[in-house]
Amino acid sequence: MGKVAAKIKVMPESPEVDLDDLQERLEGVLPEGTKINGFEREDVAFGLVALTPTVIVPDDTGGTEAVEEAFANVDDVESVSIESTGRL
């Protein structure tokens, strides 16, 4: 069984969102068998900063869909999109 690394852009609802708190909440909703291998922060515009975690998922779990859904359901998340994926 292989693993897939996915860089996922998580846009907060506003610049006022506490990114440290949002990061903790994202880590808390990870589906079983997945892990986060670091976070980056990307300045978007007008003070808005996106979180970009690199998520490692088992190849046999159907990809990143479960992670995307879990992240999208976190309070203060406006949108979730896959930036890149690759096999490990």
From Swiss-Prot:
The keyword Phosphoprotein does not apply. Keywords: Elongation factor, Protein biosynthesis. Gene3D superfamilies: 3.30.70.60. It holds the Pfam family EF1_GNE. The keyword Protein biosynthesis applies. GO terms for molecular function: translation elongation factor activity. InterPro entries: eEF-1beta-like_sf, EF1B_bsu/dsu_GNE, Transl_elong_EF1B/ribsomal_bS6, Transl_elong_EF1B_B_arc. Belongs to the EF-1-beta/EF-1-delta family. Promotes the exchange of GDP for GTP in EF-1-alpha/GDP, thus allowing the regeneration of EF-1-alpha/GTP that could then be used to form the ternary complex EF-1-alpha/GTP/AAtRNA. This is Elongation factor 1-beta. It comes from Haloarcula marismortui (strain ATCC 43049 / DSM 3752 / JCM 8966 / VKM B-1809) (Halobacterium marismortui).
